[in-house]
A protein has these predicted regions:
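Conserved ABC transporter NBD signature motif
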Residues: 58-74
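Conserved ABC ATPase "signature" region
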Residues: 95, 99, 113-131
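ABC ATPase C-loop
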Residues: 152-153
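Catalytic Walker B motif of ABC-type/P-loop ATPase nucleotide-binding domains
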Residues: 160-164
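H-loop/switch region of ABC-family ATPase nucleotide-binding domains
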Residues: 195-196
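H-loop (His-switch) and adjacent beta-strand-loop-beta switch element
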Residues: 206-221
Length: 245
């Protein structure tokens, strides 16, 4: 089953059109990078794809159901931009925050050994086991984003949607963060990433969708850098700086 499918999708804020006739599909196990200039509609498209907004026209299906119905919302892990104060809004420890990912599965029952193992495994997989008892508010931006990924893993999410998750994160932590995403994707997790850094996307994503109100390209990174889609979408001689290892 296709994870995400958008057909002839259009959306605007009042009289200002943001997306026009966007169609794309995301298959299980894909790593899709959404790129485009500032104000191109990347974040809006991501929010539409996972059902946080409803389109003005067109359709979006998430795991086969209308995305806005959120019928499979527990299968989606969403990591938004980390902003000042995010940690203060979560006055809990890392382990407690990750444990929240199990709540939808325990509305009618108590946490058991399987839940505890799922939380511990998720924390271990994202490399923050040594921070399990630390308050989220005391973490760095990159560490907080790992907590959100761990929460999605604890929830056994099938799709991880991220909106520029490393804004304000130092270069070394950024590199480690994207290596983590690559590893999780190799394990079978579907990833959709909004990112302004074209070099990061071409180095890590298996597919690229380039948009600026409309979709200019959807395909593999190698083909993307050889087409005119970059210049057409950005309206300038934009260069891709590789961040490969």
């Amino acid at each position: 089953m296709t994870v995400l499918e958008a057909e002839d999708l259009s959306f605007g804020y009042g009289d200002r059109p943001v997306l026009d006739g966007v169609s794309l599909a995301v298959e299980p196990g894909a790593f899709l990078g959404l790129v485009g200039p500032n104000g191109s509609g990347k974040t809006t498209l991501l929010e539409l794809l996972i059902g946080l907004r409803r389109p003005d026209s067109g359709t979006v299906r998430l795991f086969g159901s209308p995305a806005h119905e959120r019928a499979d919302g527990e299968r989606v892990g969403y990591v938004a931009q980390d902003t000042a104060g995010t940690g203060d809004a979560m006055p809990v420890t890392v382990a407690e925050a990750v444990r929240m990912g199990r709540y939808p599965r325990r509305l009618r029952g108590r946490f058991d050994a399987a839940d505890r193992r799922a939380v511990e495994d998720a924390i271990e997989r994202v490399g923050i086991a040594d921070l399990a008892e630390r308050r989220v508010g005391r973490l760095s931006g990159g560490q907080r984003q790992r907590v959100l990924i761990a929460r999605a893993l604890a929830a056994e999410a099938d799709l991880l949607a991220l909106d520029e998750p490393t804004v304000g994160v130092d270069a070394e932590s950024r590199s480690a963060f994207y290596d983590l995403l690559g590893s999780l994707n190799e394990e079978g997790l579907t990833v959709v990433l909004v990112e302004h850094d074209l070099g990061v996307v071409t180095a890590h994503a298996g597919e690229i969708a380039c948009l600026n109100r409309r979709l200019y390209f959807h395909g593999d990174p190698e083909t993307f850098v050889e087409t005119d889609a970059l210049a057409e979408a950005y309206g300038t001689d934009h260069r891709v700086v590789s961040h490969g290892h």
